[in-house]
Every structure is written in C-alpha cells, then in structure tokens.
Amino acid sequence: PEDGFIADTLNKKAFEVEEIIPLDTDTVFDIKVLPNRAHDSLGHHGMAYELCSCFGYTFKKDPRNKILDTIDKHVVKPLVTIDDEKACTRFMSIRIDGVKVGESPEWMKKRLEAIGQRSINNIVDATNYVQFALNKPMHAYDARSVEGSLRARFAKEGEVLMTLDDKNILLDTSTLVIADDKKVLGLAGIKGGKYSGIQTDTTSILLESANFEPTLIRKTAQKYDIRT
C-alpha cells in the first residue's frame, strides 16, 4: 500500500500517525502510541502485526531469527539475583566473551538514524536495535567492571550513580537499580552507569534483559528527569 493509505488506515483503525517522513529509499511513520498499547505496539514487530491485522495480511517471521537448541560452551551465564520480585518480575543475563567493539554495519546505522537514534558502536547499537524491533529494552555491561553477580535491588540511601551522559545522581531507597556485589551499575529500565559502559577495548560483555514494574520505572524517570 502507498504511504498515505497506510497512514489513513492506521488513523481510522488503530493509532494516530503524526508525521510521514520520506527518506531516500524508505519512509518513516511517526506514530502516537497510547499507553494502553505500549506493551505490544512500541516496537516495529508489534506495529507490523497491527498493520497485518488492518490489511488482512499474514505476518511472516524473519527467517534470520533462530532459537538455539544449545548454548555454546564459550557463552557463560552469570549469577543474577532479584531482591523484590514485584519490582522486577524477570531478569535474564548472559556473558559473552571474545567480542570486538567497532562500528555497526551500514544497514543498522541507517535504520537507527532513521528513527533518531545515534549510532554508538556495534554492541550498544545491537541492544538498541533489539529494543526498537521487539519493544524489549536491553543493556550491555563491560564484564570487567562487574564484581560478583548482577542484582536488581532498591538503592541504599546516599548511593550515587554517574550515568553514561556524565550526570551524577544521588539515589534514595525508592529507586530500583541494577548493581553488582559492591556498587550501583545503572537505573533499572532507564539508563546505565558510566563505570560499566562499553569501551573500545571491551572484550567481554554481560547482556541484560529484564521486566520491571512500569509505574515504578516511570516515577523514577520523572524523579531524576531522565528520558530515554
């Protein structure tokens, strides 16, 4: 279907299309997603399902997406701890060794830049790409900076976190954080800390994929005035 017809159909059946942005070989739709549909429609796959429903198409899964039956012996699972299962309902992590940090391929750069996301490096870009594709935020830690296990817990009064954009935040006990055995590594579901960020010489990473209580995360973002 043509771009205008797609926008008109979404406006009538699902969401408000605020802007159509033509690119050289693609088109970007700026779509307003209401809070009650954020869980399934803030990612490109979810929006693709919605479009298939609107136009009577069958959604075709990406053949490049594969589920591994076994985990390679070089991929090691780190210990993960959840202190409050209401605040963090699920927390998964895996360690990957032997990575090489560098530029992302051009196709990924273009896709991220098309939606206003600056390319940083192949590791960070991959986590951002998954977030926008699947509506599943992820985060990567430099494994060298993690002492012990990853833990989803509430901050201790007076703890301080320096975020990736060099902002020092004084935390309180209502703030859910990701920490290791000795220090805070990031604001859960919002922003990582600078100390554990991916560096050019990083060779081992910990990938985080977790589900946090959304109201708690929203309040934390408002409290510290952080929008990501």
Identify the function of each model-found stretch:
Residues P1-T228:
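RNA/tRNA-interacting regions in translation and RNA-turnover enzymes
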